[in-house]
Design a protein with these regions (language model features):
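A domain-start/cap signature at the N-terminus of enzymes
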Residues: 1-11
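Residue in the alpha/beta-hydrolase core beta-strand immediately N-terminal to the catalytic nucleophile
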Residues: 63, 120, 144-146
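Short beta-strand immediately N-terminal to the catalytic nucleophile in serine-hydrolase-like folds
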Residues: 103, 121-123, 148
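Flexible "cap/lid" loop of the alpha/beta hydrolase fold
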Residues: 132, 136, 143-174
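Alpha/beta-hydrolase
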Residues: 160-231
């Protein structure tokens, strides 16, 4: 499939560096892909982006702050057991170096740099929460919203299992082999036996993510931002 494609670039947006990539023609309808917790823009597979672009969209994917080749920030530590218990049973969020609203502003600032007034927003998991923040705070910038495997933050909604929370929030490994093994394990859990598995594809995705650069401390900060977020309904 042949579509217009601009290689990754870095923009100064909201005071930080945001690495982004564009598929599709300049005059096409803009569509922004926002990845989830600790995820990188390349987890929106190239073929997926090309297919959307071939349908008449200008696809913008990017690394959130603290992931991939975007700016690495500072502050925040691994959540303590006490902090986790307060979140789980008292709905008291931990302190966070930045919020999902800050990450929403990153997205809007990137669109400003690109000269895009409004776009379709597509977010997965934490990315869906960011997309919701954009729709609430900057409604005039949103043509449509697609929220994938995400939440509004309402504590009355069904919650993830303790096992899922434990696996997804455990410290990110620094070694390549352990990172790949954890990546494959987590995606197997997220599929929950409902979607076909492709071990070779999962491995290639994990290798690409690791080789672009992982940031365990950044994942911890993103976890705090997610837990800090109040319900938007």
């Amino acid at each position: 499939m042949s579509v217009a494609h601009k290689p990754p670039r870095v923009a100064k947006a909201n005071g930080i560096d945001i690495c982004y990539e564009i598929f599709g023609e300049a005059g096409a309808e803009p569509l922004v892909l926002i990845m989830g917790l600790g995820g990188q823009m390349v987890q929106w597979d190239d073929a997926f982006c090309e297919q959307i672009a071939a349908r008449g969209f200008r696809v913008i994917r990017f690394d959130n702050r603290d992931t991939g080749q975007s700016s690495k920030l500072s502050g925040g530590k691994s959540l303590t057991l006490w902090e986790m218990l307060k979140v789980r049973f008292l709905n008291i969020p931990p302190a966070a170096p930045y919020t999902l609203r800050d990450m929403a502003q990153d997205t809007i600032s990137l669109l400003d740099v690109l000269g895009i007034r409004s776009a379709h927003m597509v977010g997965a998991s934490m990315g869906g929460m960011i997309a919701q923040e954009i729709a609430i705070t900057f409604p005039e910038r949103v043509r449509s919203l697609i929220s994938i495997m995400s939440t509004t933050g309402d504590p009355d909604l069904p919650q993830p299992s303790n096992k899922a929370v434990s696996l997804l929030t455990e410290p990110q490994p620094k070694s390549r082999d352990k990172f790949i093994a954890r990546f494959k394990r987590n995606w197997k859990m997220l599929r929950a036996g409902r979607f076909p598995e492709d071990e070779a594809l999962d491995r290639s995705r994990a290798e690409r993510v690791f080789d672009r650069g992982v940031n365990p401390a950044g994942v911890e900060r993103q976890i705090r931002a997610v837990l800090d977020r109040k319900s938007v309904v």
